[in-house]
From Swiss-Prot:
Protein name: Naringenin 8-dimethylallyltransferase 1, chloroplastic
Membrane spanning stretches: 124-144, 150-170, 195-217, 222-239, 251-271, 288-308, 331-351, 355-375, 386-406
Cellular localization per UniProt: Plastid, Chloroplast membrane
Substrates-to-products reaction catalysed: (2S)-naringenin + dimethylallyl diphosphate = sophoraflavanone B + diphosphate
Function: Involved in the biosynthesis of sophoraflavanone G (SFG). Can use flavanones (naringenin, liquiritigenin and hesperetin) as substrates, but not flavonols or isoflavones. Shows a strict specificity for dimethylallyl diphosphate.
Length: 410
């Protein structure tokens, strides 16, 4: 009988039996006839079982069960007395302690995520690109009355499109160059492990879908084709497939930058404002031609100069940049000379402007840029990657300043 009752009690781990019972048949008969297990005993037993189960599942208890079975049998009473003692020792408190998250820790997590995304987007380039899109849109402005609500809505559409293009480009570049960036740019989120490969794929694909979808929704074919062509050119530059990976070849690199930044975006953003916002016929005014020409030179310079600080990683992975072929010093002075010649030509062209204020601003503005560039170039240490990278950032600043002058050329 003791073994039967113990088998029906699953929580017991060690049982000590004290006393004796009749053999199974006689005991079963007497048990059916006179049982001392009352209804209250069953309830108590059920509560004990549920309590033990809760302890096991929620509090990781170390449980010790001690079951003392004692009883006596006689011919007259034929009784069995049982006593069950359950001792549970918990390593944790039974009281529920709610875990509250510190608002400061939540804010720190959000701030860290935004900082990682900020670095992922390469803000120095994004700022210049957004500013460039703004001033390329201003090229379509012919009179002050054009600066209306419709213009600002069209400008916002251009900004959304160019941000999507930029995020797709930097995301694809980091995905395709992750091993190179571990050498050249180890602080980038993907190369440093702060962003996972999967997350960067999601961000990159989402930016492409959002850019194309947005251009489709606003019903602007110039904007749609600008997003599409820019993303395809970025793919040709980065993706390592046959006939692609143009970044391996200096000439194709320059063509890539000119086709994307100078031609596609300049024409696309201008035509979006001209035909979709102002509802005017397609034209190619003098400021647009000037914008395309000067931005093309900047695109070539940036394409060539960006490889100077990255020579170590490029050489290891077989990218034959112009810096590796000619040496960093020659490429450095080629870039500086290209910009100086561009400023000189721009000064001459600006002097022919029929509008006095445009003539003065164009000539003086580019004379200042040429002087500042030459002053900084003479003090650059060509053996220091840190200094070269700093000068590369300086070229981006010159590029940004140029965008302020482009809309004023008439």
């Amino acid at each position: 009988m003791g073994s039967m009752l113990l088998a029906s009690f699953p929580g017991a781990s060690s049982i000590t039996t004290g006393g004796s019972c009749l053999r199974s048949k006689q005991y079963a008969k007497n048990y059916d006839a006179s049982s001392y297990v009352t209804t209250s005993w069953y309830k108590k037993r059920k509560i004990q079982k549920e309590h033990c189960a809760a302890i096991f599942s929620k509090h990781n208890l170390k449980q010790h069960y001690k079951v003392n079975e004692g009883g006596s049998t006689s011919n007259t009473s034929k009784e069995c007395e049982k006593k069950y003692v359950v001792n549970a020792i918990s390593e944790q408190s039974f009281e529920y302690e709610p875990q509250t998250r510190d608002p400061e820790s939540i804010w720190d997590s959000v701030n860290d995520a935004l900082d990682i995304f900020y670095k992922f987007c390469r803000p120095y380039a994004m700022f210049t690109i957004v500013l460039g899109a703004t001033f390329k849109s201003l090229v379509a402005v012919e009179k002050l009355s054009d600066l209306s609500l419709a213009f600002f809505i069209g400008w916002l559409q251009v900004v959304v499109a160019v941000i999507c293009i930029h995020i797709f480009g930097v995301g694809l570049n980091q995905l395709c160059d992750i091993e190179i960036d571990k050498i050249n740019k180890p602080d980038l989120p993907l190369a440093s492990g702060k962003l996972s490969f999967r997350n960067v794929v999601i961000i990159t694909a989402s930016s492409l879908i959002l850019g194309l979808g947005f251009a489709w929704i606003v019903d602007s074919w110039p904007l749609f084709w600008t997003v599409f062509i820019s993303c395809m050119v970025a793919s040709a530059y980065n993706v390592d497939l046959p006939l692609l990976r143009w970044k391996k070849y200096p000439v194709l690199t320059a063509i890539n930058f000119i086709a994307d930044v100078a031609v596609t975006r300049s024409l696309g953003f201008f035509l979006h404002m001209q035909t979709c916002v102002f509802k005017r016929p397609t034209t190619f005014p003098r400021p647009l031609i000037f914008c395309t020409a000067i931005v093309s030179i900047y695109a070539i310079v940036i394409a060539l100069f960006k490889d100077i600080p990255d020579m170590e990683g490029d050489e290891k992975f077989g990218i034959q940049s112009l810096s590796l072929r000619l040496g960093p010093k020659r490429v450095f002075w080629i870039c500086v000379s290209l910009l100086e010649m561009t400023y000189g030509v721009t000064i001459l062209v600006g002097a022919t402007s029929p509008i006095l204020w445009s003539k003065i601003i164009t000539v003086l503005g580019h004379a200042v840029l040429a002087s500042v560039l030459w002053y900084h170039a003479k003090s650059v240490d060509l053996t220091s990657n840190v200094v070269l990278h700093s000068f590369y950032m300086f070229i981006w600043k010159l590029h940004t300043a140029e965008y302020f002058l482009i809309p004023l050329f008439r």
